UniProtKB/Swiss-Prot annotation:
Interacts with NR2C2/TR4. It comes from Bos taurus (Bovine). May act as a repressor of NR2C2-mediated transactivation by suppressing the binding between NR2C2/TR4 and the TR4-response element in target genes. The gene is NR2C2AP. Disulfide bonds: none annotated. It comes from the Eukaryota. Keywords: Nucleus. This is Nuclear receptor 2C2-associated protein. It is found in: Nucleus. Belongs to the NR2C2AP family.
Amino acid sequence: MAHSLVCPETVSRVSSVLNRNTRQFGKKHLFDQDEETCWNSDQGPSQWVTLEFPQCICVSQLQIQFQGGFSSRQGRLEGSLGSEALSKIVDFYPEDNNSLQTFPVPPAEVDRLKVTFEDTTDFFGRVVIYHLRVLGKKKE
């Protein structure tokens, strides 16, 4: 059974926040399970989210819920373990809608992930995400 691997000890970073308004649009809203809140990036050609986990994990799925009109046509998941450089795990191709989308991930043992959103549907390159979930297992 795959579980959400993002926990309070997971350190997250984002490429940008709309108008630097972290209270209303900050990264914490990616993981709060609240349908009313979201991370809203500022404009730019490529937006990203990094996650540093407190232990090694084995990723099996990535779930993302965009706001339609502010999604990405292509995404890339990269990961690393320890001090290794990030390497590509998988490319994924979201649809431009409001649904929670699930992307299978080839088994990868990592403690750091980077999700990059490219080719955004918004003319200015903004991305709006209500939920970001990393599913899999914690390594013992």
